[in-house]
Amino acid sequence: MLDLQNVNFGYSRHRKILSDVSFSVRAGASVGLVGESGSGKTTLLRLLLGLERPTSGTIRFGDDALDPADGAFMRRYRRAVQPVFQDPYSSLDPRQKVLDIIAEPLQSLRIAGPRKDAVAQALEAVGLPLDAMQRYPHEFSGGQRQRIAIARAIVARPQIILADEAVSALDLSTRIRIVELFKTLSATLTLVFVSHDLGVVASLCEEMVILEKGQVVESGKTRDILTAPQHPYTQRLLASIPRMPA
């Protein structure tokens, strides 16, 4: 579904952020991109969203190369691929009601159909009541706001969710509930989950890609990497990062 081959990215020859990144994401898979701050994982997510263009290398969605300059392709791609960002406090417009926030992709992607019905289905999927439509973000807790952000991501029925540190700004108990929500959604969607927290990825993703200083140092089945990490960087991550309950 997503295939990266020898992807490089940098702002100059002397400031390289990603080096020869190659991996694939199968349809229906849940894949964690794991690395510490500065590993390049958020930059990689920006490339996957089409917000940046690789310096070299290719990102493919199905049979097509991802080209941010191709407007027609990007409209199709953005319908198929939706993001969830880190901070539920800053990612929602406080001036808008929840109905308008969640419905935004329907409008921007020109998706026809009853707007309220689609929003109601998205709210139900994330466990929020229908009366949330007429309320504002400040009326909700952090966990509820992230549920609103997830509802916005799924309202257009995408094929892939790209989540960037989507639980790191939440308290532990809320984090566990949102991870469980992502786990439920991943049964019908492809999920790429960016996190510095190996424990979160271990509880959520069946596969993982480990990034260190812009390079893939290890990838494979999550259980295999956790059981027998091969790279010293992965071994250090496994030893130092607290794990969430499975």
Where are these regions (language model features)?
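A short, proline-enriched helix->beta-strand linker immediately N-terminal to the Walker B motif
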Residues: 155-159, 188
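ABC ATPase NBD coupling module
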Residues: 66-82, 96, 100, 108, ...
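Conserved ABC ATPase "signature" region
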Residues: 114-131, 238-239
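ABC ATPase "signature
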Residues: 219-220
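Helix-to-loop junction immediately C-terminal to a conserved catalytic motif
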Residues: 49
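Conserved ABC ATPase signature
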Residues: 136-140, 144
